[in-house]
Amino acid sequence: MKKMDMSPTIRWNPFSPGYFTDPYPHLKACREATPVQQSSTDSFFLFGYKEVDEVIRNRNFEVVDMCDYLIQKEPYIFSGQPAGCPFLGRVTKFWPLYLNGDLHKRVRRAVTLAVTRLGTPEAMTDALERTLSAFRDKTAFDLTDCCGYFNFIFLRSMLGFREDFEFTAVKRLSSLLTTMLDFYVPKQAYLAAEEAMQLSRPFFGESEFARIVREDMHDLALSDDECYSIMLVALFASFENSTANFAMSLREILPDRALTEYVLAADADRRKVLVEELLRFNCTTQYTIRYNDVPIELGGIEVPARSRLQLCLASANRDPLVFDRPDEILPERQHNPHLSFGAGIHLCLGGATARREMASVLAPMVDFLKDCDIGPARFERKILLHIPEYIPVRRRPA
């Protein structure tokens, strides 16, 4: 095995010009020039599908422990100080995306059970009808708000949070929680997330979702805060991913007359194939992280044990060695092993919900918006997630 060249011809830089609007040209350059990059002694970025897929499916590789990570990263604000983030530091121990072993399996099973029982087709239909009613008379609006409102209504039905917990508050809470998980997070972001979690706590009481989770994990005797923490994960995992995937898919479909007509004419099976292609193309979760338990070789590079492997799912999804014409949306793409929701035992919790939502409501939403013009999108300055902040929509005059 050879050692990593510490001077790659193209070095990953999320602050390169245009990255937050469209990261794919830069990711392509990284993948083609240096598909495995070492950023520090024990940290590597992986851009090629082969390497990303190999790592993400290895059941022996672990995710980062969120509690330990936060304490190590910001010891003062997570040390229990009154001016710090004691609540955030305490409850993240039940966030399944940062758990390993049996506890990960238990939390994941409980959440999946609750989502399966409560995220019904009837709840989706009701959310769609309420959304169309709320936006029908608007001549101009934000597409991300339209898609977010649909998810807000659906999640309120599923999670059972109070009716007076407003859409803007849910959107802000979800955004703060995902900001906290990003690269290069300032202390102010953690403090804002702590405050938002505390303020939102009264809106999440006992619900059918909480009852199912408690019942499935009865031997752990979850506290109210721990149950609330699990509900928060279900909230932001579903809200951020589903809203972004939905909005970005509509952004691609509506200006394309052929694609619009394809969606409206497609049967259920063809729509499912298209949904997978849209998920591959958009890839809202751009990165995930693993730690290898033993030394490994990736792309001919020696990687020491317990290295931080930062897997670029977005780059892997555009790898031409796996996907024909990867930078295009091919509605009937048959070979599509995309990694948008990860893979293996840490498959994204919000993935199943996003798939069902897209398959169920994509066509009626396209029909609702087919006479609208879509303006240039503005994207959030996040690295872990590639999500739109604002997509202007204006109805054409009759």
Regions found by a protein language model. Name each.
Residues 27, 355-398:
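Cytochrome P450 proximal C-terminal region
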Residues 230-235, 239-263, 351-369:
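Cytochrome P450 catalytic-core helices
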Residues 1-147, 152-167, 175-183:
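Active-site substrate-recognition loop segments, prototypically the cytochrome P450 B′-helix/B-C loop
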Residues 159, 169-225:
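Cytochrome P450 catalytic core segment centered on helix I
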Residues 314-336, 375:
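Conserved cytochrome P450 K-helix/beta-meander segment immediately N-terminal to the heme-binding cysteine loop
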Residues 205, 218, 265-301:
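Conserved cytochrome P450 K-helix E-x-x-R motif and the immediately C-terminal K′/meander segment
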